[in-house]
Structures are given as structure tokens and as C-alpha cells.
UniProtKB/Swiss-Prot annotation:
Lineage: Eukaryota, Viridiplantae, Streptophyta, Embryophyta, Tracheophyta
Keyword Cell inner membrane listed: no
GO molecular function, one term: rRNA binding
CDD domains xrefs: S4
Assigned GO CC terms: chloroplast; small ribosomal subunit
Entry similarity comment: Belongs to the universal ribosomal protein uS4 family.
Species this protein is from: Morus indica (Mulberry)
Record GO biological process: ribosomal small subunit biogenesis; translation
Primary localization class, coarse: plastid
Cellular compartment(s): Plastid, Chloroplast
Stated name of the protein: Small ribosomal subunit protein uS4c
HAMAP family registered for this protein in UniProt: Ribosomal_uS4_B
Domain S4 RNA-binding span(s) in chain numbering: 89-151
InterPro entries: Ribosomal_uS4, Ribosomal_uS4_bac-type, Ribosomal_uS4_CS, Ribosomal_uS4_N, S4_RNA-bd, S4_RNA-bd_sf
């Protein structure tokens, strides 16, 4: 299944705010209308919608998300929390959380077009897994800096999560530590996502 490229507002109207996909928010009452539709949601549908939230927010294909779930399942600790940490530490998401891009798709374009360096080297893989002490910097070219400056100027300047530091005048950000799952930028029940996949096998 390919990455979603359809109408974004349609998705947030059904699933709620997906800040990684779009800065738009559902209209007041749209979630309420969904809740008032006839018929009780099945447990399967509830789990499916949580999975879809995760997939659309981070801009993943079905196969990519399944791969992350399997990696998380083999790691120590809570599978759901490890899954969120893996997704949050992706380079495209780190750029988004730093405010260097307005959405994760925009961050992915910056990486794909070789505007971003990690520890002094160009990285063109959006799924690159960032680690504590990594330094993310914009390439020292006017085009690269102009693109990121536009995003920085238009960002809402929300408080950065504790695992990140931004140096906007240097076009640079740093990863201080692995993210605490409480600081994830999406309202999600990750256990339902894990349950969804455990019932598919």
C-alpha cells in the first residue's frame, strides 16, 4: 500500500488532528458528528482508526508501519512505547518537531533533496534513525537556508520537547536524548495499534 496523497482534510475530519500530515485542524464538532453516527463502533474499527492515525501522521506506508511494529516487538520494554520512540526519532519527524518544516511530508522533501546534514554529512534518507548527540544542520547554501527559514518563520513556535534543542540562527538542531513517549506530538493510544497488528497474524 502506497503512502497517502489524497485530501488531507478528509482524514483529519475522520481521525482528528494529524499535525504531521497537515497544520489544518478539524472543524469544531466534526468529531462529535462522527461519534453520533448510528451504530456503535466495533473494537476492530477502533483499533483500525488508531493505526490509521499513526500511519497518516508519520506519512508511512502500511508495510513501513508493520516493519516498525515488528522491530518494536523484538525490543525490550513496552512494544507500544518503543514503537512511538522509533517513529519519533526518524529524521523527517525530528525536522518537523524542530520547526524546520511545517509538516512531515515537507520535512521528507528537505531530506530527499539533500538539504540536510547529520553530524556534518548529507543524509537523504527520511527514515534515518537519529540518536542522542546527533547534530542536524541545514546545508550551507542560500536555497537550503531560505526554504528552512520560511518554515521557521511560519511555525507556531510551540515549546520544543525536552529531547530536542533548536538554534534557529545557526539553522541547527540537536538531539539530547531518546524521546519520552509522553512527549509524542500526537494524541494516540499506541496499545490499540499493537493489538491491531497482533490480531492480523
Amino acid at each position: 500500500m502506497s503512502r497517502y496523497r489524497g485530501p488531507r482534510f478528509k482524514k483529519i475530519r475522520r481521525l482528528g488532528a494529524l499535525p504531521g500530515l497537515t497544520s489544518k485542524k478539524p472543524r469544531a464538532g466534526s468529531n462529535l458528528r462522527n461519534q453520533l453516527r448510528p451504530g456503535k463502533k466495533s473494537q476492530y474499527r477502533i483499533r483500525l482508526e488508531e493505526k490509521q492515525k499513526l500511519r497518516f501522521h508519520y506519512g508511512l506506508t502500511e508495510q513501513q508501519l508493520l516493519k516498525y511494529v515488528r522491530i518494536a516487538g523484538k525490543a525490550k520494554g513496552s512494544t507500544g512505547q518503543v514503537l512511538l520512540q522509533l517513529l519519533e526519532m526518524r529524521l523527517d519527524n525530528i525536522l518537523f518537531r524542530l520547526g524546520m518544516a511545517s509538516t512531515i511530508p515537507q520535512a521528507r522533501q528537505l531530506v530527499n533533496h539533500r538539504h540536510i546534514l547529520v553530524n556534518g554529512r548529507i543524509v537523504d534518507i527520511p527514515s534515518y534513525r537519529c540518536k542522542p548527540r546527533d547534530i542536524i544542520r541545514v546545508k550551507d547554501e542560500q536555497k537550503s537556508k531560505s526554504l528552512v527559514q520560511n518554515y521557521l518563520d511560519s511555525s507556531s513556535r510551540e515549546e520544543l520537547p525536552k529531547h530536542l534543542t533548536l538554534h534557529p540562527f545557526q539553522y541547527k538542531g540537536s538531539v539530547n536524548q531518546i524521546i519520552d513517549s509522553k512527549c509524542v506530538g500526537l494524541k494516540i493510544n499506541e496499545l490499540l495499534v499493537v493489538e491491531y497488528y497482533s490480531r492480523q497474524t
